[in-house]
């Protein structure tokens, strides 16, 4: 992929040429200070992925890796037109919305004996079967069900042809390199090719490919096949929630023109200049927050419990956004429907 900037290079280039989205250095420091208080706790450790989320697999085995692959293959566009009227999945006495509604639906299907994490099943699954698997417990369906069906079929067929039907084989081919795994995923599976143009350059975000690498690292607890020596090279996952929380915390600022658009709920399109700026600046902002946090930890003379990387910051900030939804209502997220995030 000649002339294509990787996610970190892309975000730096976008932030340097942005017209409507800006990174606030004071806000970056404030977010780093907020995270400093969490540096010694479970929130910023790889183990937190399982400990803090009951829907994620408990095991660190092939079945768990294949669960991660299916959920991240479908990990896009969960926002609802109205917050009080949305897709909800009830599972084991609890209700889940957003991304967690997908995880609950996958677990519900497995409990019902539907082998949704098996490539030989989802390579040929029908649209009606997908509608049933992803059914909502409200009258609001999960968005983009037809696209999810198409992508499951396409991805399942490729996984069977190239990797013997198991994502663990793909992980093993990457030889403990996060970058190699990310590129293998992007090259093998078309729906993961999150690439666009900005100022005449080809830029990449690879949101789902990066989160797939991160979740594989997390489900395998950073051990064995999941011990990626270059895991810190993975950046945050540029979606529609992270920019909202970064703006809420004052690390990201929008121009009046863009803010007006977002407040009106105008839809952006994938590859629009402003959409690219929001994603690129968010990604670079988290890189700066990480650098600042590591400096603060060093100044305090503390040793973190493990490696602090952009993945763990993303996990924490995403959970923060989920837990502070009410506080963040005044800051709009950017509305877009696409398969990349």
Curated annotation (Swiss-Prot):
It is an enzyme of class 3 (hydrolase). Queuine binds at residues 53, 237, 239, 314-315, 319. One of its GO terms (biological process) is tRNA-guanine transglycosylation. The keyword Membrane does not apply. GO terms for molecular function: hydrolase activity. The keyword Lipoprotein does not apply. It comes from the Eukaryota. Its EC number is 3.2.2.-. Keywords: Acetylation, Hydrolase. The active site is at residue 239. The modification N-acetylmethionine is found at residue 1. It catalyses: queuosine 5'-phosphate + H2O = queuine + D-ribose 5-phosphate. Eukaryotes lack the canonical genes for de novo biosynthesis of queuosine (Q), present in most bacteria. Therefore, this molecule must be sourced from ingested food and/or the gut microbiota, and metabolized to its corresponding nucleobase, queuine (q), before incorporation into cytoplasmic and mitochondrial tRNAs. Incorporation of q into the anticodon of some tRNAs contributes to translational efficiency and accuracy. Belongs to the QNG1 protein family. Catalyzes the hydrolysis of queuosine 5'-phosphate, releasing the nucleobase queuine (q). Is required for salvage of queuine from exogenous queuosine (Q) that is imported and then converted to queuosine 5'-phosphate intracellularly. In vitro, can also catalyze the release of the q base directly from Q as substrate; however, it was shown that Q is not the biologically relevant substrate. Shows a very low activity on queuosine 3',5'-diphosphate, and cannot release q from queuosine 3'-phosphate and from the 5'-nucleotides AMP, UMP, CMP or GMP, indicating specificity for the queuine base. This is Queuosine 5'-phosphate N-glycosylase/hydrolase. It comes from Homo sapiens (Human).
């Amino acid at each position: 992929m000649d002339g294509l900037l990787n996610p970190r290079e892309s975000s730096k280039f976008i932030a340097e040429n942005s017209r409507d989205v800006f990174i606030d250095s004071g806000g970056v420091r404030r977010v780093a200070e907020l995270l400093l208080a969490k540096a010694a706790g479970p929130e910023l450790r790889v183990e937190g992925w399982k400990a803090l989320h009951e829907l994620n697999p408990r095991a660190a085995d092939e079945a768990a890796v294949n669960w991660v692959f299916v959920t991240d293959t479908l990990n896009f566009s969960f926002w609802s037109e109205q917050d009080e009227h949305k897709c909800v999945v009830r599972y084991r006495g609890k209700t889940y919305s957003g991304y967690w509604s997908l995880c609950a639906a996958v677990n519900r299907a497995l409990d019902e004996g539907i082998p949704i994490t098996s490539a030989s099943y989802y390579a040929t699954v029908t649209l009606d079967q997908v509608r049933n698997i992803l059914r909502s417990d409200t009258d609001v369906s999960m968005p983009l069900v037809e696209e999810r069906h198409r992508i499951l079929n396409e991805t399942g067929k490729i996984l069977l042809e190239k990797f013997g039907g198991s994502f663990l084989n793909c992980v093993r081919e990457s030889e403990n390199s996060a970058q190699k795994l990310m590129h293998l995923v992007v090259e093998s599976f078309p729906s993961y090719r999150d690439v666009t143009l900005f100022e005449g350059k080809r830029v990449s975000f690879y949101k789902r490919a990066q989160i797939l690498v991160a979740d594989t690292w997390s489900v395998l607890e950073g051990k064995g096949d999941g011990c990626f020596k270059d895991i810190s090279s993975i950046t945050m996952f540029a979606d529609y929630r992270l920019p909202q929380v970064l703006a809420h915390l004052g690390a990201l600022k929008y121009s009046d023109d863009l803010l007006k658009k977002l407040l009106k709920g105008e839809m952006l399109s994938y590859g629009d200049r402003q959409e690219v700026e929001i994603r690129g600046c968010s990604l670079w902002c988290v890189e700066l927050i990480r650098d600042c946090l590591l400096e603060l930890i060093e100044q305090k003379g503390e040793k973190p419990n493990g490696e602090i990387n952009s993945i763990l910051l993303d996990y924490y900030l995403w959970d923060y956004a989920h837990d502070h939804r009410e506080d963040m209502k005044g800051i709009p997220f950017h509305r877009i429907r696409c398969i990349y995030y």
